[in-house]
Structure formats: C-alpha cells, structure tokens
Amino acid sequence: MTGRLLLAGSLAAFIAGSAAAQDVTYEVDGESFEGYFAAAEESRGLVLIVHDWDGLDDYERRRADMVAELGFDAFAVDVYGAGNRPETMEARIAATRTVLGDAERMQALMLGGLEEARRHSAAADVVVMGYCFGGTVTLAMARTGEIEDSVGYASFHGNFPDGPAWPSDTAPLLIMHGGVDQNPSMSDLAEFVEEAEEAGLTYDVEIYAGANHAFTVFGGGRYQERADTRSWATFGRFLEARFGS
C-alpha cells in the first residue's frame, strides 16, 4: 500500500486521465450545473471535490483523476452554474461572495451535487475536499452536519468560515496550510484550532514551510512542489484511514 501511495502521490510521475471520466450536466432547483466524475477501477469510497474561486475547470478534473488513481470515485461539484467560469479577479470575488453569502443556497447546491455524484458511484461513504474557496465551502458544509455518510473533510489552503456550532459528531477534519499564507493567516488558523478544541473536534493540521496561498495550483506563481507533493500524500493517507482501507 505504501508503494502505491508514493507512486500516486508523486506528481512528477503522475499521468493524468481516468480510465472512466466524464463531464456531467445536472440540475439543482431547475438550474443547470456541470460537474466531472472520475471512476476508480475498484472504488473504496467517494470523494466530493469543491472547486477553487475560478469555477470548475481542468485543475479540478485533474485532481479528480488523481483521486480515481488512488482507488476512490471522485465527483467535482459545480457551485457556480454551467458556463459560469469567472475570469477576472472582480468576477471571482463576486462569485464566491454570492455562494458564501447565502448559506441555504450553498447547502442546496452541495447536496444537489452529492445527489448527482451518487447516481454515478455506488460508494456509500464520502469525503468532502476543496481548494481555497472550495476548502472554505468544505468546512462550511462540515459545520452544517448535512452531508449524509460523511467520513471526513479536507481543506487545502481554505479559509475558516463562521457558522453554526460544530455538530458533536463532525467527521475528522484535515487542514493543509501554507506557512506564509496570509489568506487565511496563521492567526486565523490559530483561532480555528482554538475553536476546534473547544468543540471537541477530531482534526489534523499540516503547515508547509515557505508555502503561500494556492501552493497546490500547478503552474501558478505560488505553486510549491514540495508542499503540493507532501499535502497530496497526506491526503492519500487520510482517505485510506477514513475509508478503512
């Protein structure tokens, strides 16, 4: 198992493309959305991926393929709407505020995406994960306690949203954070840890030296291969533990 994880976690050796992957158009409350499903050869669980602030694109598709390579079905959920892929900073900020500013709608979009994912995967248990904005949505959904059969939540350089009190049965959380990230900052992370301790949550935090925000974004100006590789390996171990493999 260790050898397989190391191979899958090595981004340099990774060959993108799931053997069974497809874009999926679906509806939530009469509105069209476009997700992406990547099937594992012999799935041991389902991973729901929440996209970054620019919407679902090839980055999330690649990550979904990587999850499938680890042996888990992956569904990249769309919370912006089909065709809504903002290109400017202003448009991206507006899109994230629209989603995060309406908790009821955000929850409906996430549950609708999960419902669609379950049409494609027979796996019962689910881990929710996301990048940046997607990590924030992931933790916001963890606070609601509304994801049925959730066994874990993982956030890559996401923020820590306010919300209702943490449910007592919240599944384990995995937080991966850049050491020089200012959005969220180390102070924000410390506040989350204090809150998590008070709520009695099960959580793990990894901090990567010298890594800035968006350290996992391939080709981006803040990409750090060391932090990306280490965080992906940690996430792989998290999946193995949460799905009992």
Residue ranges and their predicted role:
Residues 168-173, 201-202:
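Short, proline-enriched alpha-helix->beta-strand connector loops that line the catalytic pocket
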Residues 197, 202-245:
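C-terminal catalytic histidine-bearing segment of alpha/beta-hydrolase fold enzymes
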Residues 110-169:
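Primarily recognizes the serine-hydrolase "nucleophile elbow" in alpha/beta-hydrolase
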Residues 63, 185-195:
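Short alpha-helix in the alpha/beta-hydrolase fold that links the catalytic acid
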Residues 16-18:
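N-terminal signal peptide c-region/cleavage motif recognized by signal peptidases
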Residues 175-177:
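Short beta-strand/loop motif that positions the catalytic acidic residue
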Residues 180-184:
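Acidic catalytic loop of the alpha/beta-hydrolase fold
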Residues 23-121, 217-219:
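Serine-hydrolase catalytic machinery in alpha/beta-hydrolase-like enzymes
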